[in-house]
From Swiss-Prot:
It catalyses: a quinone + NADH + 5 H(+)(in) = a quinol + NAD(+) + 4 H(+)(out). It comes from Thermus thermophilus (strain ATCC 27634 / DSM 579 / HB8). Keywords: 4Fe-4S, Cell membrane, Flavoprotein, FMN, Iron, Iron-sulfur, Membrane, Metal-binding, NAD, Quinone, Translocase. It is an enzyme of class 7 (translocase). It is found in: Cell membrane. This is NADH-quinone oxidoreductase subunit 1. FMN binds at residues 75, 92-96, 180-185, 218-220. The subunit can be separated roughly into four domains: an N-terminal domain (residues 7 to 72) ending with a glycine-rich loop, followed by a Rossman-fold domain (73 to 240), a ubiquitin-like domain (241 to 335) and a C-terminal four-helical bundle containing cluster N3 (336 to 438). One of its GO terms (molecular function) is FMN binding. The gene is nqo1. Binds 1 FMN per subunit. Binds 1 [4Fe-4S] cluster per subunit. This [4Fe-4S] cluster is referred to as N3. InterPro entries: NADH-UbQ_OxRdtase_51kDa_CS, NADH-UbQ_OxRdtase_suF, Nuo51_FMN-bd, Nuo51_FMN-bd_sf, Nuop51_4Fe4S-bd, Nuop51_4Fe4S-bd_sf, Soluble_ligand-bd.
Length: 438
């Protein structure tokens, strides 16, 4: 059963996170204040308790926008109360998933929205220090964040006794160095501590023992920014949009051969058809597959049934895929699916930290080698079967989901496009070249 899925063309919805993206000077404090900036944080800190903020976010149905989709309010509630320890809030801005680029524009164009969201989140989880871990390649984003933090601190919006209350909160920017693995929350914390960015074994979970062994919450950029309109307009406003299990607005990204690739802020549950044809202007050439939520999500065939599927957590799970970050990638017919998956496998193999044997040997070793055989015309049918049999031996057997991220798209491609693998193996021919984006 689903709730009301508001159309992206429906006058009842309006953009909140991207309302000022692309506007001149939108990254400055003066611009943000002219448009009501920090008024929500000021009111909430004076009128609501931390527990009331958590309950409001729970009622809104906000789920993590970084890929996992865990309920945000529930995650916050895991933080201990009155334990006398330092609490930390971390914003994961290490946006490195191929096909994902939504957070970059929040960081670059509306950094004060993120800062206000982190003030609200920090208040809710009783954290007094926050860190924003920015992808190393996002230099402009990091520069603007640092400038925004400096502006906010100078006006008293960060630091001691915010808005005349007894709540203190400050922020710091940490620039990454280009490692995809740092997007995993425990590897990110190790990196912040100055250690090698290897993932940690869980439990203990970050809420019990996180950054420097202290209670910590890690949220995505879009997640934290969404807290501001929720606390401004209320949980009911947010929950009226979307589906039964996927509430509110979502930043959908679309890339590949479409007329208008980009980021579109639309209600959860918008269909692929609406995103691709009504917003992105339609494909530029024949399409064979859709990757629904960034490169780690299983691809789906480009069929009428799939096009009419709502882009929500529950609907895509029912289709054997995932919403992920909402980064839709279109694969044209002229591109070999084997080549596309081979390329992704090489990416994940390169980004593996090498800590866990299933990832180090399974992905960077066996998967890469099997793809090399099949893709260069030296494979046999048994290599395709071996690849298929290998995947469950890797999935779910490592400290972090990087190995799973390598397995899932290949698993989906074998489910829907296995004939392409078998054709290459039987005919002893390499993947068609050039298999490149125009």
């Amino acid at each position: 059963m689903t709730g009301p899925i508001l159309s992206g063309l429906d006058p009842r919805f309006e953009r909140t996170l991207y309302a000022h993206v692309g506007k001149e000077g939108s990254w400055t404090l003066d611009y943000y204040l002219r448009h009501g900036g920090y008024e929500t944080a000021k009111r909430v800190l004076k009128e609501k308790t931390p527990d009331e903020v958590i309950e409001e976010v729970k009622r809104s149905g906000l789920r993590g926008r970084g890929g996992a989709g865990f309920p945000t309010g529930l995650k916050w509630s895991f933080m201990p109360k009155d334990d006398g320890k330092q609490h930390y809030l971390i914003c994961n801005a290490d946006e490195s998933e191929p096909g994902s680029f939504k957070d970059r524009y929040i960081l670059e164009d509306v950094p004060h929205l993120l800062i206000e969201g982190m003030i609200l989140a920090g208040y809710a989880i009783r954290a007094t220090v926050g860190y924003i871990y920015v992808r190393g390649e996002y230099r402009r984003a990091a520069d603007r964040l640092e400038q925004a933090i400096k502006e906010a601190r100078a006006r008293g919006y960060l630091g001691k006794n915010l808005f005349g209350t007894d709540f203190s909160f400050d922020l710091h920017v940490h620039r990454g160095a280009g490692a995809y693995i740092c997007g995993e929350e425990t590897a990110l914390m190790n990196s912040l501590e100055g250690l090698r960015a290897n993932p940690r074994l869980k439990p203990p979970f970050p809420a019990q023992s996180g950054l420097w062994g202290k209670p910590t919450t890690i949220n995505n950029v879009e997640t934290l920014a969404s807290v501001v309109p929720i606390m401004e307009r209320g949980a009911d406003w947010f929950a009226q949009m979307g589906t039964e299990q996927s509430k509110g607005m979502k930043l959908y990204q679309i890339s590949g051969p479409v007329k208008r690739p980009g980021v579109y802020e639309l209600p959860m549950g918008t269909t692929f058809r609406e995103l691709i044809y009504e917003w992105a202007g339609g494909p530029l050439e024949p399409i064979q597959a859709i990757i629904p939520g960034g490169s780690s999500t299983p691809p789906l065939p480009f069929t009428e049934e799939v096009l009419d599927t709502p882009m929500s957590y529950e609907h895509l799970q029912a289709k054997g895929s995932m919403l992920g970050t909402g980064g839709v990638i279109l694969i044209p017919e002229r591109v070999s699916m084997v080549d596309a998956m081979w390329n992704l496998t090489r990416f994940y193999a390169h980004e593996s930290c090498g800590k866990c044997t299933p990832c180090r040997e399974g992905v960077a070793g066996f998967m890469v080698n099997l793809f090399a055989k099949i893709g260069t015309g030296q494979g046999e049918e048994k290599d395709v079967e071996n690849l298929e049999a290998l995947l469950p031996l890797i999935e779910g057997r490592s400290f972090c989901p990087l190995a799973d991220a390598a397995v899932w798209p290949v698993k989906g491609s074998l489910r829907h496009f296995k004939d392409q693998y078998l054709a290459l193996a039987r005919e002893k021919r390499p993947v068609p070249r050039p298999s490149l984006w125009r």
